[in-house]
C-alpha cells in the first residue's frame, strides 16, 4: 500500500501548486499594466520635478531677500562700530586731559589743603560738637569727609571704571567676520543649488506649460504666479529701520557737547554754593567762634540740616582765608573733567550695548536663514542631484518587468515589479510588491507602482 499512497501524495501536491500558479489571463493583465507604467510614471515624475523646481525658485527668492536684509544689518553694524570708536576716542581724550589736570592740581593743592584743612576742620568740628555732642564720633566723621575731598582733588576717583579692553573689540570683530563668512558661503550654496536645478529645467523645458516656464525664468522682483513654498515658515518681516530704531550716536555726541559743560557748571555751583546761599540769615557770625545763635536749642533746624549733610562743613571755608575760594579756584577743571569723563564713559557703554544688540540680531538672522535653507533643501534639493546623472524620465519606467512569485496559493498577490535603475543610479535593481488589497489586474496598481518607484528614486537622491 505504500507505493500507491506515495503516488497520491505527489499528485495532490502537484495539483495544489498548479492551482496557485498564475493564469495566462492574470499574467496578461500584469503585462498590460506594465505597458502603461512609463506613461503614468513620467507624468508623476514631471509633477514632482515641477514641485521641486518651484521650491528651488522660492528658495532663491528667499535667499536674495535675506541677502538684502543681511546687507542692511552689516551696514548698521559698520556704522555703529564707527560711532563706538568715536565714543571711545572721546573718552580717551577726556581721560588724558583729566590725568594731566590731576597731576598739575595735585602738586599745588597739597600745600594749600594743608593750610586750609586745620581751620576748616576746627570750625566745622566746633559747630558739630555743639549740635551733636560726642567728640570722637564727630571727629571721625569729619576726617572721613575731609579725606574724601582730598582724594577727589588729588587723585582719580575710585568710582571711575576702566575703559573697555581692546581685546573685547577684537573678539567682537572676529565674531562679525565669522558671521559674514558663513552667510557668504550660504549664499554661494543657494546659487549653486539653483544653477543645478536650472540645468534640469532646461532639459525638461518642453514638458512644462508656458506659465511655469515664464515663472521659473522670470526676474525675482516680478509678481509670483505660484504660491510660495513653505509659506508657514517664511513670514513677512518688518522694515529694518522701523524694527530696530537704532539712535544716531553722532547726534548724542552733538547734544553731549552742547550740554555737558553747562551741566557741569551747574553741578559745581550747586555743590559748592548751595549751602552758602542758605547761609544769608547767619552772616553775623564772626570768625572768632560760635555765638549763642548757633546753639542747638536756638537753631535746631540748622543743626538738623548740617547733621544730615556733612557737606555743610564747606560753608565755613570763608572763615579761613586759605579756604575762601579754594574749592572753586584752586583746581576748577578737575571736578568738571571728572563729570565729563563719567558722561563720556556712559556714552561708550551705550554704544557698546547697541553694537552687541546688532551683532546678536545678525547672528539670529544667520541662524534663522540657515534653518529655512536646510528645510527647503531637504524638501526640494533632490531635484538638483539629477543634473549629475543626466536623467531621462523614459529610462526610469521603461526598464521594468514583472516577476511572478508564489504567495501561499493567493494568485492575486503574487506579482512584483522589478526596476532596473542602473541607467540613472549606481545602486542595484529594486523590486516593488503589489499592494495587498489590490489584484494584478486592478488599474490602481499602476499608480501605486509608479509612486513607489518615484519615492525610491527621490530617497536615493536625497541621501547624496
From Swiss-Prot:
Disulfide bonds join 105-331, 116-323, 119-320, 124-313, 131-303. Keywords: Coiled coil, Disulfide bond, Glycoprotein, Secreted, Signal. Residues 1-20 form the signal peptide. Its main location: secreted. Pfam families: Clusterin. GO terms for cellular component: extracellular space; nucleus. Glycans are attached at residues 195, 255, 309, 349, 398, 429. It comes from the Eukaryota. The keyword Coiled coil applies. Residues 56-109 form a coiled coil. The keyword Protein transport does not apply. It is found in: Secreted. GO terms for molecular function: misfolded protein binding. Belongs to the clusterin family. This is Clusterin-like protein 1. It comes from Rattus norvegicus.
Amino acid at each position: 500500500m505504500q507505493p500507491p499512497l506515495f503516488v497520491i501524495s505527489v499528485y495532490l501536491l502537484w495539483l495544489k501548486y498548479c492551482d496557485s500558479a498564475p493564469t495566462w489571463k492574470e499574467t496578461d493583465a500584469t503585462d498590460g499594466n506594465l505597458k502603461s507604467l512609463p506613461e503614468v510614471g513620467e507624468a508623476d515624475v514631471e509633477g514632482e520635478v515641477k514641485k521641486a523646481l518651484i521650491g528651488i525658485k522660492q528658495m532663491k527668492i528667499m535667499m536674495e531677500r535675506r541677502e538684502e536684509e543681511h546687507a542692511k544689518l552689516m551696514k548698521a553694524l559698520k556704522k555703529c562700530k564707527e560711532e563706538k570708536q568715536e565714543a571711545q576716542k572721546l573718552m580717551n581724550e577726556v581721560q588724558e586731559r583729566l590725568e594731566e589736570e590731576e597731576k598739575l592740581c595735585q602738586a599745588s593743592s597739597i600745600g594749600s589743603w594743608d593750610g586750609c584743612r586745620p581751620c576748616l576742620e576746627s570750625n566745622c568740628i566746633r559747630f558739630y560738637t555743639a549740635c551733636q555732642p560726642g567728640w570722637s564720633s564727630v571727629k571721625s566723621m569729619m576726617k572721613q569727609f575731609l579725606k574724601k575731598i582730598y582724594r577727589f582733588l588729588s587723585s582719580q576717583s575710585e568710582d571711575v571704571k576702566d575703559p573697555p579692553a581692546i581685546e573685547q573689540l577684537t573678539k567682537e570683530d572676529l565674531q562679525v567676520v565669522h558671521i559674514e563668512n558663513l552667510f557668504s558661503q550660504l549664499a554661494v550654496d543657494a546659487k549653486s543649488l539653483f544653477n543645478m536645478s536650472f540645468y534640469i529645467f532646461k532639459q525638461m523645458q518642453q514638458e512644462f506649460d508656458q506659465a511655469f516656464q515664464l515663472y521659473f525664468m522670470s526676474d525675482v522682483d516680478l509678481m509670483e504666479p505660484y504660491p510660495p513654498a513653505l509659506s508657514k515658515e517664511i513670514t513677512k518681516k518688518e522694515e529694518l529701520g522701523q524694527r530696530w530704531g537704532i539712535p544716531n550716536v553722532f547726534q548724542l555726541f552733538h547734544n553731549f557737547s552742547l550740554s555737558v559743560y553747562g551741566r557741569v557748571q551747574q553741578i559745581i555751583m550747586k555743590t559748592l554754593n548751595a549751602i552758602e546761599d542758605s547761609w544769608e540769615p547767619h552772616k553775623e557770625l564772626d570768625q572768632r567762634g560760635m555765638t549763642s545763635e548757633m546753639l542747638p536749642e536756638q537753631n535746631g533746624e540748622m543743626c538738623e540740616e548740617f547733621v544730615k549733610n556733612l557737606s555743610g562743613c564747606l560753608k565755613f571755608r570763608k572763615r579761613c582765608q586759605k579756604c575762601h575760594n579754594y574749592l572753586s579756584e584752586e583746581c576748577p577743571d578737575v571736578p568738571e573733567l571728572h563729570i565729563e569723563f563719567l558722561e563720556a564713559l556712559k556714552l561708550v557703554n551705550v554704544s557698546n550695548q547697541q553694537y552687541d544688540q546688532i551683532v546678536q540680531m545678525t547672528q539670529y538672522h544667520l541662524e534663522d536663514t540657515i534653518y529655512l535653507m536646510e528645510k527647503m533643501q531637504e524638501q526640494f534639493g533632490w531635484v538638483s542631484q539629477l543634473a549629475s546623472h543626466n536623467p531621462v524620465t523614459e529610462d526610469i519606467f521603461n526598464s521594468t518587468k514583472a516577476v511572478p512569485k508564489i504567495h501561499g496559493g493567493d494568485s492575486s498577490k503574487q506579482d512584483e515589479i522589478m526596476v532596473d535603475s542602473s541607467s540613472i543610479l549606481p545602486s542595484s535593481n529594486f523590486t516593488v510588491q503589489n499592494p495587498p488589497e489590490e489584484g494584478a489586474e486592478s488599474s490602481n496598481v499602476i499608480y501605486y507602482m509608479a509612486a513607489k518607484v518615484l519615492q525610491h528614486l527621490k530617497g536615493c537622491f536625497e541621501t547624496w
